A protein has these predicted regions:
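Conserved structural core of kinase catalytic domains
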Residues: 1-56
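Short, glycine/acidic-enriched loop or turn micro-motifs at the edges of active sites
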Residues: 23, 79, 119
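Conserved protein kinase catalytic core
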Residues: 26, 91, 122-124
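Conserved hydrophobic alpha-helix
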Residues: 63-67
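Catalytic-loop of the protein kinase fold
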Residues: 69-79, 84
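Conserved protein kinase catalytic/activation segment
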Residues: 81-114
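C-lobe/activation-segment region of protein kinase-like
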Residues: 102-186
C-alpha cells in the first residue's frame, strides 16, 4: 500500500501504524436516510435510488474483493464499518459530524473505505473470506431489508475484483447452510 509522505526506507522499517480521519458518513447512514427519503416521496424517486444503490453495492463488492485479495478478512463487515468518502473537492463537514452533502450524490461519487479492523486477521482460508461475506450479507439484510435484493451486486462485483472468488462463493453457500441450521436449532 502506498502511503503519501513515507518513502520506501521508512515504510520497510516495520512497526508503523497509520491512522487517518475519514471524511464522510457510513454506508448505513446514507442508506437509511435515502430509504427514508424514498418512502416520503422526496429525492429523485425510487428507480433512481435503486440504481444508485446498485452502484454502491458494486463499490462495496470491489472493496471487499480487494481486501480479500491481499489476504485480510475484516471480521465485522457491516454497513456501519463502510464509509463513503466524498471526493476532496466535495468535502464539507459539520464539526466532525455528518457531511453536508446530498445522499444521492454521495452514493454516486463516494469512495468506499473499510473501517474498524479490530476483529480482522490475515488469512489464506477461503472459509474465513466466506464468513466475512456471510456476516455482511446478514447485516445488510437485517439493517436494510427494503433493498436486500440489491445485495447480489456485491457478489457480482466481488467476483470480478477477486480472482479466488469462485471458490469463496461456493464456500459461502456452505456457510449459509450452517448458519440456517444453527438458527433453526437455536
Amino acid at each position: 500500500m502506498e502511503v503519501e509522505g513515507l518513502d520506501r526506507e521508512e515504510k520497510s522499517a516495520g512497526g508503523w501504524m497509520l491512522m487517518e480521519w475519514v471524511e464522510g458518513r457510513t454506508a448505513k447512514e446514507v442508506l437509511v436516510a435515502g430509504a427514508r427519503r424514498v418512502k416520503e416521496g422526496k429525492g429523485t424517486g425510487k428507480a433512481k435510488w435503486e440504481e444508485d444503490v446498485r452502484g454502491l453495492m458494486g463499490k462495496i463488492g470491489k472493496a471487499v474483493g480487494e481486501m480479500h485479495r491481499v489476504g485480510v478478512v475484516h471480521g465485522d463487515l457491516t454497513t456501519s464499518n463502510l464509509m463513503l468518502r466524498p471526493p476532496l473537492h466535495k468535502t464539507v463537514t459539520n464539526g466532525g459530524g455528518a457531511a453536508s452533502q446530498d445522499e444521492e450524490e454521495e452514493l454516486r461519487i463516494g469512495e468506499i473505505v473499510l473501517i474498524d479492523f479490530g476483529l480482522s486477521a490475515q488469512t489464506v482460508q477461503d472459509e474465513d473470506r466466506a464468513v466475512d461475506l456471510y456476516v455482511l450479507e446478514r447485516a445488510f439484510g437485517s439493517t436494510h431489508p427494503e433493498i436486500e435484493g440489491e445485495f447480489q451486486e456485491v457478489m457480482r462485483a466481488y467476483g470480478q475484483s477477486y480472482r479466488g472468488a469462485e471458490v469463496v462463493l461456493k464456500r459461502l453457500i456452505e456457510v449459509r447452510m450452517r448458519g440456517r441450521k444453527r438458527s433453526m436449532l437455536g
